[in-house]
Amino acid sequence: MKLRSFPVKIFAMAIAMGSLWSCQTKEAAKDIIQDNVDNAVAQLTLQTDIIEKSGKFLNPRTYENGKMNYVPIDDWCSGFFPGTLWYTYKLTGDKKWETLAAKYTEQLDSVKHLKWHHDVGFMIGSSYLNGLLLDGKEEYKPVIIEAAKSLSTRFRKGAGIIQSWNVDKGTWQAERGWTCPVIIDNMMNLELLFEATRLSGDSTYYNIAVSHANTTLKNHFREDNSCYHVIDYNPETGEVLHKHTAQGYAHETAWARGQVWALYGYTMCYRYTKDERYLEQAQKVYDFIFNHPNLPKDLVPYW
């Protein structure tokens, strides 16, 4: 009987040790998450203290060449700082961050009228939309809808897409020879349109978002499911004029950040539409990224 019970005891010990290891692993994961939250809070505390003491409205974008880089409200990254504050409030529950998030969000009010580039979705989505979704700020709804109207003015019906950048004479975009450039980043702005339809009941925004997603699905991707950065269109006919990059290494390379814009963008489009094609494309982009032989072991891709 003792010999027979020995394997049972070993098995029981293994289960107990496995449970202990599992608990320790979960606790370690919690510690990592909390450590990161604490670090973010410390950095944001330092930065908001600097800004508040300055008496100015400053919008930090990045730390570069030994100093903080602040940007005007029409910069495409202007919504990221208030967005970070909203997430910090959500993670900590500290009302201090709610107050600061609202303050820096509402400094961007005039962005709702911005029509000269497509990134109003980034700017208002990260700030006002997060305020609504994370904190129930109902008073932000009109700003979100107005911003969607502004973004919709960039829709080129003949091509079925939202034009990303203007090509005014003298701009670097014009010097590239583009007519109606659309960048993969634009997929990120569609969430603003989907939300505007949900909030207003006006399907115009939804239809523009779907048209843009479908046209991008058709033209932006290579056979291996990597994507180009820039597709240049004839805005009247939808003819593809150029397949280029603006920030990648070369036209036929897969710019790392752009692949993630595509992955997030089509996952988000599936969430709003339940169109299986979008989910399938997101999976294909995921497979391209994570099965790529040049992806480093730390999973941080080269530029």
Predicted regions: what is each one?
Residues 1-31:
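Bacterial Sec-dependent N-terminal signal peptides
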Residues 26-303:
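Glycan-recognition and catalytic cores of secretory/periplasmic carbohydrate-active enzymes
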